[in-house]
């Protein structure tokens, strides 16, 4: 009896999985599944991990070029509890056939197993990534912020969405950086003679170098370095806002 029950469950699992191998099965009408992101920087494709991770939307993960987790998610049925019960109750012959092989307790466990397995499919799987205009705009701003913080102050990012057949789409991002800004000179203006003398002792350890490209992170590191150095030298209440 247990073997028969296991075969029934296995058959349901295999049938459901094969039926689910349609990547757009859970994509609503008038929506599109994101199948590819492409980033072009100054006309050249750049899909390095660092740049690609700036995007707010990534396509569904793939294993050997197969969106396996998406297929697993698609195998789940919406409202499975009502579907299972309605399916059995609406077909008296099916209920009698199940009751012939299963006891009342086993039938309840069968229904419980169907619902539990369906929930497992949802949590283990990955919902389809639907192209989202707001997230595309956020990605554009994120790309601009990244390049701005690395010295390209005139950066501009745009995008284009290409819809494909069968409710799929690709998104291309185009980044024009302009020329980078270079630090050509460094000057200091420190009102306190004590602070000025402490700063000059460690000035050679500065993260900011002449003729190097501007980077926001470099200036943040320098502020931290100066603050730590001054506090360690007795200027305990020094603030980075000074």
Regions inferred by a protein language model and the residue ranges of each:
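Interaction-mediating elements
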Residues: 3, 22-242
């Amino acid at each position: 009896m247990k073997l028969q029950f296991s075969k029934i469950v296995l058959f349901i699992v295999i049938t459901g999985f094969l039926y689910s191998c349609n990547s757009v099965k859970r994509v609503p009408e008038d929506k599109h599944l994101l199948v590819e992101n492409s980033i072009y920087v100054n006309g050249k494709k750049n899909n390095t991990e660092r740049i690609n991770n700036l995007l707010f939307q990534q396509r569904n993960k793939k294993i050997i070029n197969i969106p396996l987790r998406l297929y697993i998610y698609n195998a789940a049925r919406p409202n499975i509890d009502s579907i299972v019960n309605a399916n059995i109750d609406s077909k008296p012959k099916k209920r009698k056939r199940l009751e012939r092989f299963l006891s009342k307790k086993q039938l309840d466990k069968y229904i419980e197993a169907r619902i539990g397995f369906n929930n497992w499919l949802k949590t283990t799987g990955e919902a389809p990534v639907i192209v989202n205009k707001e997230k595309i705009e956020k990605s554009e701003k994120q790309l601009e912020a990244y390049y701005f913080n690395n010295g390209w102050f005139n950066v501009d990012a745009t995008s284009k969405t290409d819809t494909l057949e069968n409710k799929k789409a690709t998104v291309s991002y185009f980044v024009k950086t302009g020329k980078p800004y270079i630090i050509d000179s460094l000057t200091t203006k420190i009102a306190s003679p004590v602070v000025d003398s402490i700063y000059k002792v460690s000035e050679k350890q500065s993260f900011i170098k002449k003729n190097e490209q501007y980077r926001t992170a470099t200036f943040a590191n320098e502020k931290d370095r100066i603050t730590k150095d001054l506090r360690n030298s007795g200027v305990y209440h020094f603030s980075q806002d000074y």
